[in-house]
Amino acid sequence: MRLNLHATEKKTTVQNVENPNNSTIPPLQQGSSSSAPQASGGTLASEGKNIASMPAIRQHLSADGENGAARQKNKSFSLKNFLGFKKTTKAPAQPTNPGSNVPESSRIRRPTLGDFLAQPEQDGEIQAPHPSAASPRLTRSPGVSRHSVEDMRDKPVAKADPRETSAIDIKHQLNNFNQMRQNILNKTRPFSQGATTSSVMDARAPLPAIPSTTSEITEEVDATQPEQQLPQRHLDARENPSRILKTGRDVTSIHRFRPTLPAIAENTAEAEANRRIQPLQTPPPLENTPVSPLSLTLDKGKLRLADSNPTAMNTLLEQTLGKEGQHYVAHTASAEGNHHMLLDEQGHLFDLKSHEGGYSVFHNSLPSTVKMQLSKNNDEPIKLVNDNGKLILDRGAEGQEVLHLNPPGEIHHAYLSGIWRHSVAGEMNQENQWVRIHDDKIHYLNNEVGVWQTSDKTPYSQLSVQGDGKLYAVRDSRALHNLSDNHVSESFVDKIKSFAVSEHGEVAVLTDTESPHHICLMPSANAVSSERIAFSLHLADTMQMLQRGEPHLETQSIALKDGRLFAADSEGKLYCGELSQIKDGELPMNPMSQNVLKQHFGHDHRIEGFFTDDNGQVNALVKDNFRQMHACPLADDNQFHAGWNLSDALIINNQLGLNNINPAPHEIVNLGHEGSLTLQDGKVHYFDQLTRGWTEAEAGCQQLKKGLDGGAYILKEGEVKRLNINQSTSSISQGRDNFFALPHVRNKPEPGTALHGLDKTDKAQAIAVVGVNNYLALSEKGDIRSFQIKPGAQQLARPARTLSQEGLNGTLKDIHLDKKQNLYAVTREGEIFRQAREHWQQGESGRGWQKLTMPPGESGIDRIETDAHFHPVAVLLDGSRYQLRGETWHPQNASEPTQLETGLRDSQRVFARLNQDMKGGLIPGTGLTIQASAQLAGKTGRENRQIKSKFAERVRAYIFNPTMATPRPLKNIAYNLQHRWQGRRGLSAVYEMQGALIKQLESQNVRNKGAQTDLQSKLDALDFGEQGATLLKNIKQFREELENSATQAAILLGKHQGVLTSNGQINEKFKPPISKAAIQSFNVNRSGRDLSKGLEQAVRAASPSPQSKLQKLLSHFVTSGLNMSHQKGDIPLGRQRDPNDENALTKSRLILDVVTLGELHEFVDKAALISGHNPDPSQIAQLHQQFEALRENQYEANPVKQFTDMGFTHNAALEANYDAVKAFINAFRKEHHGVNLTTRTVLETQGNASLEKKLKDTLLSLNAGESMSFSRAYSGGLSTAFVPTIKKIPVPIVPGAGITLDRAYNLTFGRTDGGLDVSFARDGGVTGTLSVSTGHDLLPYMTGTQTTAENASDWLSKKHKISPDFRIGATLSSNMQRTLQNSLNFKLTEDELPSFLNGMIQGTLTPVDLMKKGIEHQMKQGSKLVFNIDVSAASDLRAGINITADGSKPDTATFRASTGLSASANLVSARSERSTTVGQLGNTVSASDNRPTFFNSANIGANLTLSAGVAHDFIRGASVSQDGTTKPEKKPGTFPAFMSVNVSAALALDNRTTQSISVEMKHADPVSQNDIDELISTLGKHFKDSMSTTLLSSLKNQENPDPAEQLKSLDRHFSYNNVVGDDRYEAVRSLKQLVQRQRAAESNMMELGSAKHTTQYSNLSRLDENGIFDILHHHFNAALPPTSATRISNMMANNPLLKALIQKLQSSPFTSASVSMELKDGLRDQTEKAILDGKVGREELALLFQDRNNLRIRSINVSQSVSKSEGFNMPTLLLGASNSAGLSMGRNIGTINFKYGQDQDTPRRFTLEGEIAKANPDVASALSELKKEGFEMKS
């Protein structure tokens, strides 16, 4: 296979450079590198692109081109000749394609690595492989698959069925493959070269030695057997390509471009002997492609793939080209089978090619033109005919030509894969060379073994075939290298930005300068500087100059063709100029209006670059508004036409020889369920769980460390970043152009935002990480600094602390932390030092370092590391290992190999076990799940007996605990009354502190009568010298923190009292209520004093700043007459707190802040005594100690501060959440508790110790989107009915009523970024029910009797007859339920989880201790109101016995047995819900007002019931009236009371739909330098104009930058740009959002966080189908905006892949779906600005969600939940009670996240998360098989 050269107008004359030795310089040959079949793929996205920049005029002659330059000087240079205006017009002959006529028989098969490894050795002789069939492979060789070392060692080729596969031991394979390779190489004597070659090689630097393992197999090999040496040489070449060197070549003149190889020939005789080796007969040597051509056909329009194809390729093609619904009308293929073209019904033309580098397939950009012709087909057959490179579409049997198409060429495939082919001069003829760039280095494909090899370490870029058919690349950023002719240009001064070569070999170069319009024109790549022509590009249109304010063109990329220069500017616009018009160093450039591209791709398309195709046509690389790249050829009409889609493609590349790593066990960082990482040569690699191989992820890293929180962190360019494991797929284009999107998520680590605090100028050398909020760094100067970050914010909680150096000796090399956070430092001299956690956290004031004794042994320390449990391990130079336990070192065995494959996680096993316990399924075609349930004699959860606890344990847990203790129901009632009166004993510290703060405020107001200088001014006047600079900075930060905290508390109180609006502005309409003081006077817990006046007095006396917003707010409270009372210092009657104050804790927090500000004033006054007197370190240390006591002990440790930081505003919510936490401590601590019992049953453990371990392992294995919940619920109620006597109605009417009190507790663990999300919740509610029932006995009609009594039988007893009946009945009921909700949510890191679980399960921690665990606490409080109307019907066959005596009145007792069927349905349901979530970072308000919905749920069931009860007849006795009339006895009605036990089973389905709106307001962080750096990087990628690049460069290089000022500069420059294109739009939006955030931070206001409208569906068909009421609503009002279902349905219609994904989600049982909608960008930006202007509050914001024209679909989520619940229902005569506990798990089945651009109605792309994002098993197996064969799918 050879490169197809396009026709040129004139053959290019290449001038040969003189050789000093008068020898012919051969072309550049292949290089070498070590490789293995498990080699990992690198990032190849940038290969083969021409990204342009600007020229350099001044040049320096290179040594290589000196003689050539001298010859060029002697020749005259003519611009006319240079531009191609020759006197002759003779057209050259069209070159033929050298590869097109090569017969298949000439393609000799060559062996692969599998062949060599599969051949057994017997008596020193290698046997040919067995001719039995082998499974299809990516190579043509029939060798065995590379499964494991054992499969390849000492075994013949397996004769089993090739389709059978064995389990793959990846770990063993990776650890031993290099050993096997080295063993083979050790016993193989490679070919040798002659003496001349040896002398050349000896002068070169030797290659690094290949590491060998400790265990080697040595075997003597007879070197005289030629049939053995050739395959061993091939094996040597594939496994150690650095040993390859062809014989018979003169290498003296090309050694600069050849791999450096050691001399391998002992003498000339040996070399001659090696040359006489006969070729291997079986298999024959392969000289061409190592990739098997594909065989495919069409069968009735469906793609059929041959079994002979590689199985992996068949799988991938079946999932893409062969997927369901894809039909084809025509197919054509080359004779060799390496090139196929397919045409489908929609006009998509697919081009599939196999070549030496792999496989590639893509399709045309504009199928509509072809589809138009197909629509005229009239069922006539369609044929594709390839006529000398032209593709003809024929119709009918006679072959009527319908359409001529230009097929893509080899260059299109090369551009996609990054693998290029060119021809070089060989010994006998032209040879094909396959070239690529990897890691900025040129690599060549060794055709004998199919391995990529590198020549040298010189960096290369911009590899491409140019207009003259030659392969070029930019060498070392400043020189142009013609690889085909081996010419290197003289280096330019500036970096080459873009270059172009015409069909005649002329070269235009654009270099990267501040003026991107200078071009350098050369007659050839190796022209000397005197032959270069420099000129500038200027705009020919004067009006365009005026509009731009710049006469020159800001060029980004260029192309040359037919004497014309094409250029794309920074805006992606196209220009063209005639080179003949160059005058005075200027070339006028005219805009090329591209109406055709605009029509096809929209007005916002961009020209990103150019390339020349196989036909010599210039192609523009056009990016459309969906970010897809298209190759568009230039036609005769001077227009670029839609060509080929280069983004929607399938690329499989050969990666053999690239990125082969085999890390040692100690080099692997194990992240548990998230996989494994390693750092090799500054590059982070991850073990890909999909391909089961190591893959590169991030380069340029100094260190990779595992934090104590379980996360991975890197040190890169002086910054610390957490590596977040990817959980979503790459972006998938919305629309139909995503044929080759194979959704799959890989566990690739991606660096997050740099952790705050560390400055790049510190040049950190090593890190030790506690978690994302706490880390230490070792600087280049040897200082160790600790950083404490405020959780959830980009601010330091306190300034960085530099650790004391006392006790340290030597130069520090690395630092580590153990599991107790003790710090270890190792020096370059091999000494180890330790400092305890409590000491290093104090910084310089902490104690010194302790030098540890050296481990035993004579060898020195090599390194310190920590094991999986963070125990320090010292590794000596001799490899021995010692673990530190206490103060002594203990020998440790060598590290065990890390388990690289994660396997089945514990959480997956538990989920599968619970899922097995669920009974039910999906009703076909409905989207509804039907679920079964059963109960037996009051015991619930009996539908499945696979997970069940013992009967005795259930009785003890849910009914009766046989002890002498007070029964639990009685204790609960008593505790509830006690807690309501006096609060919780565990919260007494909070109650006491609230009273103490009142007294402190009063005391401070007595001391401070007059005003004094504000605190900020006092601090500005302090001078502690250099020694006290850090202390002064700490004090200033604390002052700012106090003022901001007090201001936020005052705003919160003002909003609640009504004196401020919801957006924090002054409420001009506020009037103090007249009756408020009178009402508060009746509250004995209130002090009656005005808190506003007391606070205003304290702040006025000790103001925090000159323009204090706090002081202004409090003054406004006073002047507005706000009488804000507070509780007494001492609460009477033992109540401890005021339970009726809804802002008690907020008031206490405000008092705390104000009192602390006053004390800080006093502290600063004392500190001022030594200010300006250069205080000594002891004085500074004393001040620091006093300051720490004030900040840490009095403020941070204050319980009011701690609980208000969690979001609590009053005591009732705090007590409710305290109760929830305590309930679960008791639930897990007591083994007889229902929660403990259910959890142990599900997890299959015995006892609390094993429960703690299994629960820890399960929770740590939770993946993103997974959660585990524990529930505890009980209820009690009263219900009754009355049967009135109504004679005129044939059926009875039975009214009923009931009331139920319920309480539920819930504990949930869910996976979140950086840890686990923990939520404690308590819900309490009351439900009232009204019902009316009726029924009738059908048995008399069936038996022919008149009444039920006539069917009675006395066969059992003469006195107590059995009365059978067959009764049908119906009930109409309504109920209203009100529920109060309380919850506490926080985040736990993985290192905190074990102690958390231990304290909860063993009961060693109090509820307050557990509540203080974790970070980012949030308190939620809300209420829910639900109204339902239900209808039910039942039919029962009953038999009752009246067990009272006949005639007994008024009470009768009855025993009844019955069996029957029942059905119920919800007719109407309405729901309203409100909740507020408050935390230190912000608050969220959610509201759900759902209109009445109909037919929401249904239930059918069967039961067998035994019941007994009593009925009381209300009888009015007979009486005689005054007139003597006798009134008979009258029975108004009957009052029944029954209890029952039954066995029942039911099927239920839910069709509910609910909607809610949530608005989050969060505290704004000031913009940081990290934010600016990321913003500059983003803007720089998309704004290439000179003004923007100059601004961005100047900001990036500023010294001591101010982020706020830099943000203003960026805003001024970019806010006025007319943004076109989605990339620029998103970049500018990021800038605007930062500007809004900074504005909110400066004004101490809250910014808008998330604002969304969410619709929840129980019926998944409602995702894309409207309900009946929506249909009717739109029928009568067509102007209504489309519903979310309509929008999703339209997106599915336009995207078959999205349709398939959603339909797959809808097919999952036990699921619920949610659709989130958000404000469109423009409206959101306006809203954010209005919020900061004080014009819009939360109420006005909620109104925007009522109009769906303002919204866009944000995401679609489908989640699945499985559960196990056990309990007991205990009905009595009138009272009923229930008690239950359960464990449930949820997981994210799939989330589809949509991304938008400038078009806010149609998403541009989407990503997938959850289970649906995982590759299906077939694709996963295919990708894994590709990896084993050395191939990878390119993203």
Curated annotation (Swiss-Prot):
It comes from the Bacteria. A motif (WxxxE 1) lies at residues 694-698. One of its GO terms (cellular component) is host cell. Major virulence factor that may function as a water- and solute-permeable channel dedicated to creating osmotic/water potential perturbation and a water- and nutrient-rich apoplast in which bacteria multiply within the infected plant tissues. Essential for pathogenesis in its host plant, sweet corn. Causes water-soaking and cell death in sweet corn leaves. In susceptible hosts, it may act as both a broad host-range cytotoxin that causes water-soaking and a suppressor of defense responses. Also induces cell death in several non-host plants, such as N.benthamiana, tobacco, beet and A.thaliana. Has growth-promoting, defense-suppressing and cell death-inducing activities in non-host plants. In a yeast-two-hybrid screen, interacts with the maize protein phosphatase 2A (PP2A) via direct interaction/association with specific B' regulatory subunits. Belongs to the AvrE family. This is Type III effector WtsE. It comes from Pantoea stewartii subsp. stewartii.
